[in-house]
Regions:
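Catalytic-core regions of core metabolic enzymes
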Residues: 1-169
């Protein structure tokens, strides 16, 4: 229905897809097929959403308070984009950074990555001029060559890239 309405982007918070077995995997693959055919960006499923600290847009149910002053501060400072395949890590690390008055640009929970991957979000975050640090929490990469290209681009732009690769959970 959303594809027929030409919806450009969707956040799917719900779990029970690929991580839930064969039936869930089939449903997730169908979502990916629809998204690709419609040119739709999908965050998730099985994610906690994302927070754009620069434009004060929290697309999440995680408690966040971004005042106009905080957004202006974040935009004026060299800041951090935190991209995570784990929703819990996204919420905890973003809150911890904010509590320490470290400026953030984005905090993203990619979830199962049915149609948009951590590499997509990394490439987007690289384009934000005020973002100076790209911090990633990732168990796997669907497009390792794109990751390496993004790392080279970050180096060219003088941006730091930090990766925590925890392995299997």
């Amino acid at each position: 229905a959303l594809a027929r309405r030409k919806t450009g982007a969707v956040v799917i918070f719900s779990a029970g897809f690929a991580e839930g077995g064969a039936e869930g995997l089939a449903q997730q693959e169908e979502i990916a097929r629809i998204a690709q055919a419609a040119g739709m960006v999908i965050e998730g499923p099985n994610c906690l959403g994302s927070i754009n600290y620069l434009d004060r847009v929290p697309l999440t149910f995680v408690d966040t308070d971004i005042s106009a002053e905080q957004a202006a501060f974040n935009r004026a400072q060299p800041n951090i984009a935190f991209l995570s395949q784990s929703g819990a890590m996204m919420a905890v690390v973003a809150r911890s950074l904010a509590d320490r008055a470290l400026p953030l640009s984005f905090a993203v929970s990619t979830g199962n990555e049915a149609a948009s991957t951590i590499e997509d979000y990394l490439e987007y975050a690289l384009q934000e001029p005020s973002t100076r640090v790209l911090a990633l929490f990732a168990e796997s990469f669907r497009h390792p060559q794109r990751l390496l290209a993004a790392a080279r681009r970050a180096q060219e732009l003088g941006k730091l890239m930090v990766l925590l690769h925890p392995g299997k959970s």
